[in-house]
Amino acid sequence: MRSPIKLEFSEKYDKDHAREYFLKHQDGLARRLSHKRDEQLARRALALAGEPGLVLDLPCGAGRFWPLLAEKPNRVIIGADNSEAMIETACAAQPPEVVARVRPLQTSAFAIDLPDNSVDSIFCMRLFHHIGESAHRKTILSEFQRVSRDSVILSLWVDGNFKAWRRKKLEQRRSAKTEQDNYQNRFVLPAETVEEEFRAAGFRIQERLDFLPFYAMWRVYVLRKG
């Protein structure tokens, strides 16, 4: 199954970019601490979702969360990404005993190459802040509703915090300096807007987990079907 929707940023992930992406989250103390906080939120989200046994990690990127997902001994992990280079990098970079637990799958979040109700949970970290168009988010959420039997765990940037306010100010200054529209592939989304999109797609919000409340833009949502 091939996706009819192509986003410009997704085309950049060749082998070199995939390797850079893997190394990025290990570069410096601040990034390592940020990763630890990401892991804390991910563990809590998985617990709230009932420690699902069959998880689709989409997009899996360079497998950053595979060791965490593999902490549950009997969990089956499908590591999926639109980029073949990302999957290859993940399989080469992550510990062999972890990779042995993962079923690789090259597929798009816009058209997931899996049957209906085929996984317990979809684990979607660091994708939705790249999706600026509501129609595109709705397509992904429709696929998540189709493929997941029970839950979705996803992260994105939301408004209502200091970092979002500061980013908006910086973007206003940049746009004032140039008459051309700069390409943008990261978006701060109004929480009210995305939460309505979740409900419209047939999900209820079980929990909201903020990276740093009132300061950071990152938020993890735990969504349940029905």
Predicted regions, residues:
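C-terminal alpha-helical "lid/dimerization" subdomain adjacent to the S-adenosyl-L-methionine
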Residues: 158-200, 206-209
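Class I SAM-dependent methyltransferase "Motif I" SAM/SAH-binding loop
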Residues: 59-61
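Class I SAM-dependent methyltransferase SAM/SAH-binding core
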Residues: 64-110
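Conserved beta-strand signature within the Rossmann-like core of class I S-adenosyl-L-methionine
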Residues: 149-157
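A short glycine-rich, Lys/Arg-flanked "PGG" loop and its adjoining helix->strand segment in the class I
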Residues: 138-150
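A conserved beta-strand element that flanks and buttresses the S-adenosyl-L-methionine
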Residues: 123
